[in-house]
Amino acid sequence: MQIDRQGMSVLAEDECFELLDTMQLGRIALTERALPSVLPVRYARFGDGSLLFRVGDGAILRAAQMGQIVCFEADSGDHTLERAWSVTAIGQLTVVADAGLLAQAEAIDLVPWSAWSNTFVRLAPQVVNGRRLGPVG
């Protein structure tokens, strides 16, 4: 097990994806009007390993239309925060436009937050990092 300089366990990429599969809520960090923005999103893993989001007309859709490089983050911890984990995935955000991919996306149980969240976008991670926090020793 690798430990970083802050004493946190560094997770292997497969561990990161296993943890992401246990959650449905994360955050996307993107650039909006030349400023950083962090927005909550529901997500699911797509068949090819990418992350799938269902969004409405807003900053995330605009970022996907521009093919922006974004950072996604999800985490979890117990109520005392004695044990927690965090996973980040960095990559290009794109709109799912291919008919075959859209059919696959529709088959995934990704409940939208609103009736206007009807566009699928996906993040193909190029860099995946994770850390696990816990008691030392």
Task: List each language-model region with its residue ranges.
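Short beta-strand segments
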Residues: 23-56
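Structural motif
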Residues: 49-50, 69, 92, 127
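Extreme N-terminal tail/first-helix region
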Residues: 1-21
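Short, surface-exposed beta-strand-loop junctions and turns on beta-sheet-rich folds
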Residues: 34, 59-61, 137
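Short, active-site-adjacent segments that bind or coordinate small-molecule cofactors and metal centers
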Residues: 108-137
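Short hydrophobic/aromatic-rich beta-strand segments that constitute the beta-sheet cores
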Residues: 52-54, 72, 130
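Short, structured beta-strand-loop surface elements
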Residues: 57-118
